[in-house]
């Protein structure tokens, strides 16, 4: 373990997140305060507080417009992005545009607030960091965070920014399937030598990734990635929700669609039923007073669930075929198939995949929800220099998910780095001018697989000026693409004759947060955190005075004290207790020191009487009883 303390691995998921740490030679997946090993990627804002994780998800039915989830679908994207526009139709919360970037709008403590997706993700990361710190009993500073293989540069950078806002040193951003492969590589360390082709099938709550890797002598190489950024467990839930909403309409002639709360309660029940159907062939759904006082009791069979999702289940095989084509492999050449993501527990999906690979056994040895965090934790240990023999021989090669290149004459895409190239990588190519005496060139950087740049995604552009006048085709302009281990791209253009150069780090043009933005968000995150803590302290003080009051009340009303305490003293205490109880009812939102003051007031009345009662006890003031009889203590 490094002197800086352990580094953690965080699987920042679309719907759920998970955190692990590598220590004592093995990975521990860390449970949260609710005992769950995965935590919902949800943040909720109320009139009084901010909630993250289970607490946020549990109250979503009551507070749908101020409960944010799916931040991963917004991060690193433009507001105008077609996927953002289509996703917005399905979200109960508002998304607004600020300078072309999406922000979520909520009401928090009675005020309208807006947050960038990076800020919401940083709140989820803060929760994961706190879960780890509670388990490890100390501060955590460094982490490896995972992203889908599909994430482009700006999405990776924005995820890294979210980690920075949290106050984490992000050691590296790695692909989720690569992380799962690391977990798998450790689990299967003892296999026979030789190269091994592994297919990773990752079907989570919100994204679907298929990756093919080769593993040889502890070296992982990603051969291909494919998938669908918009397929997962939630889509299966939606099918069930629509089906049951129709059933409700048929039975009760009522349409629940306009009622957000009813739909949300139905969705929660569907999610539970779906999980049940992975182990049972039937699940019952019982929702009291779903809509306009009508109860909804029904059941759904596994067969019906499979039928509702038949097309979605089948479509999961297309990326498998594409990944095989890209890796230039036949399905018979895949030695191992690894399941990742909660949705791979669905028996029908396992069967389709197994049949596709002619009955080959699937690897389910790793808990599918935890495999990614597991691998990230191992990678974090390697990066901070863990010398454990379990991780020593591991080397990690990642790839670019899309080809990267520049636009040349006529709008043609000229790739410098082909997709699925192992990173880090550096490629240089020489270009020239298109017209005589051209004094500047515009370098436009694109990612994508299409022949024309108009069909690809513009990452950024810059001008190289000051080229000496010359006939077309004479100047030599050297363009270099350099991708680091995090998949972040630097593009440089240099005029060979003058040595003049210009460069761009591909982030700015795509709405990357500025350093000032990040600093501001770090401060805000600190402020929200201290507000949350202040609220916790306030509630603790309220609970303390409440339980103290009721304890005292109970003590003096106890039959055993009959005759030991005068009626006058007894009434004095009971009157004061009642006064405090009435005050508490009226002041649910008082400040911490007001509650503490009330408790001291009550102690001043009670302590002298109580210590008189148990002779030999200390005189008033401290709130502690003596050794005889029941002790009454201040509640911390």
UniProtKB/Swiss-Prot annotation:
The modification N6,N6,N6-trimethyllysine is found at residue 564. Its main location: cytoplasm. Residues 2-389 are annotated as: Nucleotide-binding domain (NBD). Residues 616-628 have a biased composition (Gly residues). It comes from the Eukaryota. One of its GO terms (molecular function) is ATP-dependent protein folding chaperone. ATP binds at residues 13-16, 72, 205-207, 271-278, 342-345. GO terms for biological process: cell differentiation; response to cold; response to heat; spermatogenesis. PROSITE patterns: HSP70_1 (PS00297), HSP70_2 (PS00329), HSP70_3 (PS01036). Residues 613-636 are annotated as: Disordered. The modification Phosphothreonine is found at residues 408, 414. The keyword Phosphoprotein applies. The keyword Chaperone applies. It holds the Pfam family HSP70. GO terms for cellular component: CatSper complex; cytoplasm; meiotic spindle. Residues 397-512 are annotated as: Substrate-binding domain (SBD). The modification Phosphoserine is found at residue 403. It is found in: Cytoplasm, Cytoskeleton, Spindle. The N-terminal nucleotide binding domain (NBD) (also known as the ATPase domain) is responsible for binding and hydrolyzing ATP. The C-terminal substrate-binding domain (SBD) (also known as peptide-binding domain) binds to the client/substrate proteins. The two domains are allosterically coupled so that, when ATP is bound to the NBD, the SBD binds relatively weakly to clients. When ADP is bound in the NBD, a conformational change enhances the affinity of the SBD for client proteins. Belongs to the heat shock protein 70 family. Molecular chaperone implicated in a wide variety of cellular processes, including protection of the proteome from stress, folding and transport of newly synthesized polypeptides, activation of proteolysis of misfolded proteins and the formation and dissociation of protein complexes. Plays a pivotal role in the protein quality control system, ensuring the correct folding of proteins, the re-folding of misfolded proteins and controlling the targeting of proteins for subsequent degradation. This is achieved through cycles of ATP binding, ATP hydrolysis and ADP release, mediated by co-chaperones. PANTHER family: HEAT SHOCK PROTEIN 70KDA. Interacts with FKBP6. Interacts with ZNF541. Component of the CatSper complex. Interacts with RABL2/RABL2A; binds preferentially to GTP-bound RABL2. Interacts with SHCBP1L; this interaction may promote the recruitment of HSPA2 to the spindle. Interacts with MOV10L1. This is Heat shock-related 70 kDa protein 2. It comes from Capra hircus (Goat).
């Amino acid at each position: 373990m490094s002197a800086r303390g352990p580094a953690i691995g965080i699987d920042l998921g679309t719907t759920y997140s998970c955190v692990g740490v590598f220590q004592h030679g093995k990975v521990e997946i860390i449970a949260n305060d609710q005992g769950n090993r995965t935590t919902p990627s949800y943040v909720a804002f109320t009139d009084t507080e901010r909630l993250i994780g289970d607490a946020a998800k549990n109250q979503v039915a009551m507070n749908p417009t101020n409960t944010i989830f799916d931040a991963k679908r917004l991060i690193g994207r433009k507001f105008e992005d077609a996927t953002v526009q289509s996703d917005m139709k399905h979200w109960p919360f508002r998304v607004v545009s600020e300078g072309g970037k999406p922000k979520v709008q909520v009401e928090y403590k009675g005020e309208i607030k807006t947050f960038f997706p990076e800020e919401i993700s940083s709140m989820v990361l803060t929760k994961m960091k706190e879960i780890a710190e509670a388990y490890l009993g100390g501060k955590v500073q460094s982490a490896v965070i995972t992203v889908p293989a599909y994430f482009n540069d700006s999405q990776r950078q924005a995820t890294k920014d979210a980690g920075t806002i949290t106050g984490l040193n992000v050691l590296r951003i790695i692909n989720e399937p690569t992380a799962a492969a690391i977990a798998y590589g450790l689990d299967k360390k003892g296999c026979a030598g030789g190269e091994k082709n592994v297919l990773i099938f990752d079907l989570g709550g919100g994204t679907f990734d298929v990756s093919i890797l080769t593993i040889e002598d502890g070296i992982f190489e990603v051969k291909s990635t494919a998938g669908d950024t918009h397929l997962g467990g939630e889509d299966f839930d939606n099918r069930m929700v629509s089906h049951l909403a129709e059933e409700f309409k048929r039975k009760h002639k009522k349409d629940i669609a306009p009622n957000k709360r009813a739909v949300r309660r139905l969705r929660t029940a569907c999610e539970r039923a779906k999980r049940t159907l992975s182990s049972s062939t039937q699940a019952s759904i019982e929702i009291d007073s779903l809509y306009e006082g009508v109860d909804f009791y029904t059941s759904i069979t596994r067969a019906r669930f499979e039928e509702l999702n038949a097309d979605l289940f089948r479509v999961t095989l297309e990326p498998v075929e594409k990944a095989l084509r890209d890796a230039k492999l036949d399905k018979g050449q895949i030695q191992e198939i690894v399941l990742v993501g909660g949705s791979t527990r669905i028996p029908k999906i396992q069967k389709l995949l197994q049949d596709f690979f002619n009955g080959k056994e699937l690897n389910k040895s790793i808990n599918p929800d935890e495999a990614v965090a597991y691998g990230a934790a191992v990678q974090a240990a390697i990066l901070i220099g863990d010398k454990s023999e379990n991780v020593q021989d591991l080397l990690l090669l990642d790839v670019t998910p899309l080809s990267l290149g520049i636009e040349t004459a006529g709008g043609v895409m000229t790739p410098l780095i082909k997709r699925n190239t192992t990173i880090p990588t550096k490629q240089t190519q020489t270009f020239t001018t298109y017209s005589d005496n051209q004094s500047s060139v515009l370098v436009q950087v694109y990612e994508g697989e299409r022949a024309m740049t108009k069909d690809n995604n513009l990452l950024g552009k810059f001008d190289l000026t000051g080229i000496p006048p010359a006939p077309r085709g004479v100047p030599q302009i050297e363009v270099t693409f350099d991708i680091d281990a995090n998949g972040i791209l630097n593009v440089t253009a240099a005029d060979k004759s003058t040595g003049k150069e210009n460069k761009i780090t591909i982030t700015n043009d795509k709405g990357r947060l500025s350093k000032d933005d990040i600093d501001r968000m770090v401060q805000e995150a600190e402020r929200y955190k201290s507000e949350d803590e202040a609220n916790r302290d306030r509630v603790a003080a309220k609970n303390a005075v409440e339980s103290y009051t009721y304890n005292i009340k109970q003590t003096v009303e106890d039959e055993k004290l009959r005759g030991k305490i005068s009626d006058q003293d007894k009434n004095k205490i009971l009157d004061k207790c009642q006064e405090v109880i009435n005050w508490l009812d009226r002041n649910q939102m008082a400040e911490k020191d007001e509650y503490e003051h009330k408790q001291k007031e009550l102690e001043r009345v009670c302590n002298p009487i109580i210590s008189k009662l148990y002779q030999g006890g200390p005189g008033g003031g401290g709130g502690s009883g003596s050794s005889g009889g029941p002790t009454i203590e201040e509640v911390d």
